[in-house]
Amino acid sequence: MSYTIAAQVRTEIGKGSSRRLRHAKKVPAVIYGPGKEAISIVFDHKDIINIQENQDFYTSELTIALEGKDVKVRVQDMQRHAFKPMIEHVDFKFA
């Protein structure tokens, strides 16, 4: 199954800006990989909360629509809140 997530590039980086994003129902994330520069991104929490319940979300390639470009990635790591059904941060790896 193919999943697509619409995202924007993040300009503010750090703990304070990440907390502000989470309060606004956004998820900070990063895309990295060998030989490529890391890209900090942000997307809506509602875009990922339902699709992450499917098992193939973690093993298949995802498409991130990033400023008019489609970037193929795989989920490397996902950090969740301790007791709330919230995703706090996602690490993606270039596919």
From Swiss-Prot:
Keywords: Ribonucleoprotein, Ribosomal protein, RNA-binding, rRNA-binding
InterPro entries, sorted: Rbsml_bL25/Gln-tRNA_synth_N, Ribosomal_bL25/Gln-tRNA_synth, Ribosomal_bL25_short, Ribosomal_L25_dom, Ribosomal_uL5_bac-type
Keyword Oxidoreductase: no
A single cellular component GO annotation: cytosolic large ribosomal subunit
Pfam families per the UniProt record, alphabetical: Ribosomal_L25p
GO MF term set: 5S rRNA binding; structural constituent of ribosome
Gene3D superfamilies linked to this entry: Ribosomal Protein L25, Chain P
Gene Ontology biological process: translation
Keyword Acetylation: no
Quaternary structure annotation from Swiss-Prot or TrEMBL: Part of the 50S ribosomal subunit; part of the 5S rRNA/L5/L18/L25 subcomplex. Contacts the 5S rRNA. Binds to the 5S rRNA independently of L5 and L18.
Task of the protein: This is one of the proteins that binds to the 5S RNA in the ribosome where it forms part of the central protuberance.
Entry similarity comment: Belongs to the bacterial ribosomal protein bL25 family.
Name of the protein: Large ribosomal subunit protein bL25
Source organism of this protein record: Shewanella pealeana (strain ATCC 700345 / ANG-SQ1)
Gene name in the database record: rplY
